[in-house]
Amino acid sequence: MATPSSIPAEPKRDVVNRIHRVTRGNRSLWYQMTVLQQPERARACGSGSKANSDRRPVDPPPVVELRIIEGPSVEEGKDITFDYNANFFLYASLEHARPLARGRVNTPAAGNPPILTGVPASGMAYLDRPTEAGYFIFPDLSVRHEGLYILTFSLFETTKEERDFDLEPADGDLPPGVDYRMEIKTDPFSVYSAKKFPGLMESTQLSKTVADQGCPVRIRRDVRMRKRESKPGAGNSNSGGNGFERREEDFGRRRTITPASEDPHSIRNRSHSNSSEQRTPYTDASRRPSMVDAYPPPPPPPPSYEPAPSASRHLDFGDSSAAQYPTPRQYAHQPGLQITPGPPSASYAPTSQSPYSKTDAPYGYVNRNIPPSCPSPAPSLKHELYDRRQSTSTYVPPSPSVYSTEGHHRRDSRPSYPPTPVAAPRPRPMHSQTSLPALKIDQLVSPVSPLPPIEPQTGPAPELPPINVGGKRKHESVFAQSTRPLHNGQRQVDPHYGRSHRGYSPDHDQGWYSRADGQISSVQFNRYYDE
């Protein structure tokens, strides 16, 4: 078995190679070939059924330059690359960078040469940049197996003029006019597996220059390098570890990585609401949110009218235990008593700071001001209904506050009457003194007989004409054609003309046409026609 000391070191290869030959016409020609762009890396494309379509080109693509100089020496000669009448092509072959030691048992896989796929031959392109010369470009070279390889380029020439032939044919196996000239090798490059491939770098400036002149070279504007973290024991994964561990590592790299739960950025922020923690049992689900909840509660009533502890809210809409309408505040019966509205309470927010602006009465109802609630004196009595129309002043308006001036409107809960537009009354001045008659408590509150139900404020609106509900007209009301089958050349009768006239109207000055609703109408024409 070969030891590392017995393996010869790989000599450094020259990137420039020259040959000299003399033609039949006694011309002294020098061939100089240079590898301008060396291959660095490649990804193995495999040897399966999809390897031919799954190309993984060598990166960067190899570029070889050729110059032809005529003269006694390279330094004293003349560059005739563009003037020399011949065709050149370069053939690429793949070789192992290090010689493989032969084992005791010769296996078929050990004797097989490495497989190079793609387009291994390239013709010479005459380019002006980076310098005027001939260039061979290999943008489609792929390697099937991973390892360390080198590329060998062999130059062949097809001579066109007889004076440029060799004095003696060099190789008898080649057809006449085709001669092998020289070869050059690249530096070693690595071919990685799909798991270990580091990625592709941005295209080189030489590749961009060649592509700008029309050569088929793929250009990458960004870097596509993988960022891999070093794992313990990754260096000896090929020599050590069993196949199960390698498969597990491969599966871990391919699967989608889910962020850990301890990552603070991956956890969704929880709601700051504590409504679920302070939820009380048997909540009032029938209550609707209203604008009244946005204001502070009104001041408590006088001590003589202190209600039961059950009345703790200003308004309870939809609550079966609460009164349908609040009972007006009761005052002593004093004839000729004048009540002056006082200034707004300090605990109320000013009108300009209210979050709601004053609006007119919606849906055409009369604007009504709801006074502060005053509960019933006795909880056992039924809450009576009373009429609170604007035209009848049967109670004293409350002190001007946000409850009376901000426009809390109430809608009648009688859906049997359609809404009727009513002009909103003029707002009363806040600081004007109004003289009102005394309240009659006996008429407002009766412990025995309930008040009559609320009546509509205006008479019923006149009935509107019926509105046609959207629908389609019948077919026979639009189209006059018959639906019966036609036989023996029969045709539908054209409704635009009479039955006795086929294609013509009875009068030359009059035409008939069918409207969209199925009606037949006529139109008068000018009297310019031949008799």
Curated annotation (Swiss-Prot):
Q: What happens when the gene is disrupted?
A: Suppresses aerial hyphal growth,reduced colony surface hydrophobicity on solid media, and increases the ratio of macroconidia to microconidia. Impairs production of fumonisins and fusarins, and reduces pathogenicity against maize seedlings.
- GO annotation, biological process: sporulation resulting in formation of a cellular spore
Source organism per entry reads Gibberella moniliformis (strain M3125 / FGSC 7600)
Designated name of the protein: Developmental and secondary metabolism regulator VE1
Q: What is the lineage of its organism?
A: Eukaryota, Fungi, Dikarya, Ascomycota, Pezizomycotina
Keyword tRNA processing among UniProt keywords: no
Residues covered by the Velvet domain: 26-220
Pfam families given in the database record: Velvet
Q: Which InterPro entries match?
A: Velvet, Velvet_dom, Velvet_dom_sf
* Feature: compositional bias, Polar residues: 348-357, 479-491
Per the annotation, the residue ranges of the short sequence motif Nuclear localization signal are 40-45
Q: Where is the composition biased (Pro residues)?
A: 295-306, 416-427
Give me the ranges of the annotated region PEST.
430-461
Instruction: Write out the biased-composition intervals (Low complexity).
Output: 391-405
State the family it belongs to.
Belongs to the velvet family. VeA subfamily.
